[in-house]
Amino acid sequence: MTNIRKTHPLLKIINSSFVDLPAPSSLSSWWNFGSLLGVCLAVQILTGLFLAMHYTSDTATAFNSVTHICRDVNYGWVLRYLHANGASMFFICLYLHVGRGLYYGSYMYSETWNIGILLLFAVMATAFMGYVLPWGQMSFWGATVITNLLSAIPYIGTDLVQWIWGGFSVDKATLTRFFAFHFLFPFIVAALVMVHLLFLHETGSNNPTGIPSDSDMIPFHPYYTIKDILGFLIMLTALSALVLFSPDLLGDPDNYMPANPLNTPPHIKPEWYFLFAYAILRSIPNKLGGVLALVLSILVLAIVPMLHTSKQRSMMFRPLSQCLFWFLVAILLTLTWIGGQPVEYPYVIIGQMASVLYFLTILVFMPLVSIMENHLLKW
C-alpha cells in the first residue's frame, strides 16, 4: 500500500515540499537561512498575537499599555522582548539570505528572486509600522520623518501624507491604522512566502558550485530537516540570550520616553536594520533625490540578474568577484555605522562616498570584473 503522505491531498503537498523534495547534496549552512526566516516569522506572529491581546492603539494609552504588558502581564516582558529582538534576528537572517543569493548566483531564478525582493519590502514596511506602536519619542518622530518623505512625490505628495496620517500630523488616527496594518502584514508575508517556495520548487535549489546538480540529489528528509533543526536551536539560543541578558542592546533609550510632539530628540534615527538605507537617504541633500536613492538601494537588487555577465553562476570559483562582494559588505557596514551618527563632518562625506560606492559596485564594478574574469579564463 502506498504511504498516506503520498496520497492524502494535503499531506502530499507537505511531502513534496519538505519530505521527498530532491535537494542538491552539497548545500552549505548558508542554505539554512530560508528555514530560519520561517521560524522567525512564526515567532513574530505568535508573540505579536499575544501582545495584541493586551495592547491598546490609542495615543493616550499606547505607551502605558506596553508598560502594563512588561510589568503586570505574566511573562509579558518575555513576549515584548522576544518580539522586539525577534525582529532583529529576522533582519539578520534576511540580509544573510539575500547575501547568499548574491554570492552564489541564486538570483538567476528570477521569479523566486523578485518575490524575495517583494518580501523584503513587505517585512521592512511591517517592521517600520511596528516601531511606531509603543508610542515612545523615537516611535513618534520616526513615524513623522519617514511618512513625511512621501511629500517629496510631485503634485500629490502633500495630500498623500495627510491621507496616510488621517489628519494634519501623526496622531491617534495614524497609530490606529498602523496597528491594523502591522497586524495584517505578517499574514500577507506568510502568503508571499508560499509563492516564494512555489517558484523555488519549480526549479529546485541552487548549490554552492552554481553547477546543475540534477544527477546528484538527496531527499530533503532526513538530511536537511536535521540540519535545519540544528539551525533553529542555534538561532533560538542566540535570541534567548539576547532577550534574557541584554534585551535593550539593540533598542533606542529615547523610546522609553512617552511621545512628545513639542520636544524633538537630538538624533532621530530608525532601528539598526534600517540604518544603511537611512544613511543613503541622508547622503543626498535633495528631498526627492534622497527618497529615490532610498527606494533604489533595495530595488537595485531587481536588476542584478540582468547585470550578470559572468559565464559562471556562482562566485565560488571567481576570486576577483569575491573581493568585490566582501567590499560591498564592508560598504554596507560603513553605511550602517554612518546612519547612526549625527549629520556633521566627517560623517556626511563618508556617507556620501559609501553611498556612491554602493551603487557603483553593484551596477558597474561587478559586471566589469565578471567580464574580466571571463577573459582571464579564456571563455
Swiss-Prot record:
Name of the protein this chain belongs to = Cytochrome b
Q: What is its main location?
A: mitochondrion
Indicate yes or no for the key word Chloroplast: no
Q: Which residue spans adopt a coiled-coil conformation according to this UniProt entry?
A: none
Q: What family is it from?
A: Belongs to the cytochrome b family.
- Gene Ontology MF term list: metal ion binding; ubiquinol-cytochrome-c reductase activity
KW Metal-binding (keyword) present: yes
Its source organism is Glossophaga leachii (Gray's long-tongued bat)
Question: Residues that bind heme b b562, according to the entry?
Answer: 83, 182
Note the InterPro entries from the entry.
Cyt_b/b6_C (IPR005798), Cyt_b/b6_C_sf (IPR036150), Cyt_b/b6_N (IPR005797), Cytb/b6-like_sf (IPR027387), Cytochrome_b (IPR030689), Cytochrome_b_C_euk/bac (IPR048260), Cytochrome_b_N_euk/bac (IPR048259), Di-haem_cyt_TM (IPR016174)
Question: Which Gene Ontology terms describe the biological processes this protein takes part in?
Answer: mitochondrial electron transport, ubiquinol to cytochrome c
**Matching CDD domains:** cytochrome_b_C, Cytochrome_b_N
Ranges that cross the membrane: 33-53, 77-98, 113-133, 178-198, 226-246, 288-308, 320-340, 347-367
Q: Where does a ubiquinone bind?
A: 201
- Please tell me where heme b b566 binds in this chain: 97, 196
Q: How does it assemble?
A: The cytochrome bc1 complex contains 11 subunits: 3 respiratory subunits (MT-CYB, CYC1 and UQCRFS1), 2 core proteins (UQCRC1 and UQCRC2) and 6 low-molecular weight proteins (UQCRH/QCR6, UQCRB/QCR7, UQCRQ/QCR8, UQCR10/QCR9, UQCR11/QCR10 and a cleavage product of UQCRFS1). This cytochrome bc1 complex then forms a dimer.
Keywords attached to this Swiss-Prot or TrEMBL record, sorted alphabetically, are: Electron transport, Heme, Iron, Membrane, Metal-binding, Mitochondrion, Mitochondrion inner membrane, Respiratory chain, Transmembrane, Transmembrane helix, Transport, Ubiquinone
Q: What else is known?
A: Heme 1 (or BL or b562) is low-potential and absorbs at about 562 nm, and heme 2 (or BH or b566) is high-potential and absorbs at about 566 nm.
Annotated Pfam families: Cytochrom_B_C, Cytochrome_B
Q: Which cofactor does it need?
A: heme b
What this chain does, per the entry, is described as: Component of the ubiquinol-cytochrome c reductase complex (complex III or cytochrome b-c1 complex) that is part of the mitochondrial respiratory chain. The b-c1 complex mediates electron transfer from ubiquinol to cytochrome c. Contributes to the generation of a proton gradient across the mitochondrial membrane that is then used for ATP synthesis.
Compartmental location: Mitochondrion inner membrane
Membrane topology type: Multi-pass membrane protein
Q: How is the cofactor bound?
A: Binds 2 heme b groups non-covalently.
Phenotype when changing residue 371 to T: In strain: Isolate TK 4812
